[in-house]
């Protein structure tokens, strides 16, 4: 699993993205992931866009990553790889991003979200992922590691992590961090807690916290936090409603605004907020939002 996160030679997903006919949606099934109308809908919509539009979307994403290094005063030239995380259906955009990252001197690392309980973190998915066939199932099994989580397991996993990072230290040292494509618009899901599901005991919760803290420190020693960066961009999926194409196009417009112009506006807001003790947020018209943030 450590190697998957830093080695561009493990190119299962990259090969699908670069060498498939993306106009033929059957490529989606090559991943072995669940494919729903969200994945096919996004792919169909992106296929309706011109290459210029796709390149512009990808450029916003890749430039955001590059600018993260610049604004953080970090040297991107030290890095040779970037981790792309995305939802199936966005392959046209990801393909353009892969090529643009190459122009920056970065190879792409793309791995599947964790499947085994040893590597999963609750029901959250990091990596490339398809649809979720049964959200309740994912929720029910979010703490299956309660089956085996004990002090000995924590020690073994941390030792294995350390050994793996030692083996792939050179690859980890030149890894730049994640570039994430998130989605929104999913229908609300209210999980039901079931007594049959495995759940952490209080002692296991402390063990999991210890494991998270220690594994984070190990990762930071090899993929140095002060040298890496990230970017996140988000797009809607068809589940958002019948206005999906229009909403998607409007999000593209927002994402492709001149960042230099709005960077100045954002910095002005940040500088002003730095002088405040609290901020009061009130809704307009029928919006009843009333928040006080300290």
Which stretches of residues belong to each language-model region?
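Active-site bordering "gate/hinge" segments
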Residues: 1-294
């Amino acid at each position: 699993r450590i190697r998957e996160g830093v080695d561009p030679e493990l190119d299962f997903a990259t090969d699908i993205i670069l060498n498939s006919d993306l106009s033929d949606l059957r490529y989606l099934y090559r991943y072995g992931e669940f494919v729903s109308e969200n994945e096919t809908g996004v792919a169909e919509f992106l296929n309706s866009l011109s290459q210029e539009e796709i390149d512009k979307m990808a450029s916003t994403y890749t430039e955001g990553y590059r600018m993260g290094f610049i604004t953080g005063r970090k040297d991107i030239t030290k890095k040779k790889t970037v981790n792309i995380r995305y939802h199936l259906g966005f392959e046209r955009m990801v393909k353009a991003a892969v090529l643009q990252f190459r122009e920056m001197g970065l190879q792409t690392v793309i791995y599947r979200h964790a499947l085994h309980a040893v590597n999963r973190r609750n029901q959250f998915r990091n990596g490339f992922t398809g649809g979720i066939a049964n959200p309740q199932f994912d929720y029910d099994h979010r703490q299956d590691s309660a089956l085996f989580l004990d002090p000995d397991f924590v020690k073994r996993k941390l030792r294995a992590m350390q050994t793996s990072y030692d083996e792939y230290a050179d690859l980890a040292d030149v890894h730049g961090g994640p570039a994430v494509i998130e989605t929104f618009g999913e229908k609300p899901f209210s999980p039901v807690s079931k007594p049959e599901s495995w759940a952490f005991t209080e002692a296991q919760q402390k063990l999991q916290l210890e494991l998270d803290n220690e594994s984070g420190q190990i990762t930071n020693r090899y993929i140095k936090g002060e040298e890496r960066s990230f970017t996140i961009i988000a797009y809607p999926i068809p589940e958002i409603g019948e206005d999906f194409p229009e909403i998607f196009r409007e999000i593209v417009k927002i994402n492709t605004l001149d960042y230099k112009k709005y960077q100045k506006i954002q910095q002005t807001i940040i500088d002003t907020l730095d002088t405040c003790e609290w901020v009061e947020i009130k809704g307009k018209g029928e919006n009843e939002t009333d928040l006080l943030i300290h």
